[in-house]
Regions:
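Catalytic-core regions built around general acid/base machinery
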Residues: 47-54, 108-118, 171, 207-211
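Short alpha-helical
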Residues: 42-44, 70, 203, 229
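Mobile, glycine- and charge-enriched loop segments
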Residues: 1-11, 49, 53-62
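Active-site acidic/histidine proton-transfer and metal-coordination neighborhood
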Residues: 25, 34, 58, 65-154, ...
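Glycine-rich, proline-tolerant flexible connector loops at the mouths of alpha/beta enzymes
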Residues: 34-53
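Histidine-acidic metal/acid-base catalytic patches
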Residues: 1-29, 78-83, 135-153, 160-251
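A cross-family glycoside hydrolase active-site/sugar-binding cleft signature
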Residues: 6-10, 36-38, 60-63, 88-90, ...
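Flexible, active-site-proximal loop/turn residues at the rims of small-molecule/cofactor binding pockets
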Residues: 11, 41, 68, 93, ...
């Protein structure tokens, strides 16, 4: 059976800011099984959790800061309120410029994973293109695998992997059970250009779906920006992924 489909709510951040509940209801009406929050524009985690529950929407995961230092309690409280299993975060390109910086960044990730585990959660790293650039002839993510604890998971963003010139299906296969969350997005795979509905761009989505068939827990649509109407693209992405049986929806 295909993994259930969710939407990263960053995709509809502008719409949510104008009216959180109507947009979430629209996502449920489309058939999305779950959502992945990244902030709560115009609402609170408590209010959002009640709305999600009333609509039967699962919270597959959430993007947040690292559960460390001053942010620790805030992140953990949010996770408890939403009843989620997976915490997801990442770092910017400047944190991976040298091997020493990669080590320091991975140490923060390892600490985050330990805090997550102590609180019954998992911690996943969300990638962009810079984790797949070369440093001294070696992809940055390969250094990361050297320094990361084996309990640490990944949310593979297949669009940014493709944009970096790497093969997303091969990455998903390589990571296996360490990649339970897949960010499915599509477009021209050119930095700075708007994305498209899933199925309308250059990402080899069928290959990704096949690679993650046995290991992906969630297929999460995310469009950072879009060349067409965002909510229309969100629905078209759902129709494509569920219609091709690459993901499982509620309709």
């Amino acid at each position: 059976m295909p993994a259930p489909i969710a939407l990263q709510l960053y995709s509809v951040r502008d719409q949510l800011a104008k009216g959180f509940e109507p947009v979430i209801r629209q996502l449920a009406d489309i058939g999305y099984v779950g959502v992945e929050p990244a902030g709560f524009p115009g609402t609170t985690p408590e209010q959002a959790a009640k709305l999600f529950k009333s609509l039967g929407l699962q919270v597959c995961s959430a993007h947040s800061g690292l559960p460390l230092g001053d942010d620790k309690n805030k992140v953990l409280d949010m996770a408890k309120t939403l009843g989620l299993k997976h915490l997801v975060s990442g770092k910017g390109p400047d944190d991976f410029k040298t091997v020493e910086l990669i080590k320091k960044t991975c140490d923060l990730f390892n600490q985050s994973a330990q805090v997550a585990e102590e609180n019954g959660l998992t911690f996943s790293i969300h990638n962009h293109w810079w984790e797949f650039e070369l440093l001294a002839g070696k992809p940055v993510y390969k250094y990361m695998l050297d320094y990361l604890d084996k309990s640490l998971l990944f949310e593979v963003d297949v669009y940014w992997v493709t944009t970096a010139g790497a093969n997303p299906a091969a990455i998903v296969t390589e990571l296996g059970k360490r990649a339970p969350l897949l960010h499915i997005k599509d477009g021209p795979c050119v930095k700075g250009q708007p994305m498209t509905a899933v199925g309308d761009g250059k990402v080899d989505v069928p290959a990704v779906a096949k690679a993650g068939a046995a290991t992906a827990e969630w297929m999460i649509v995310e469009l950072d920006s879009c060349a067409t109407d965002m909510l229309a693209a969100v629905k078209k992405s759902y129709d494509y992924l569920v219609g091709q049986r690459f993901a499982r929806g509620n309709k």
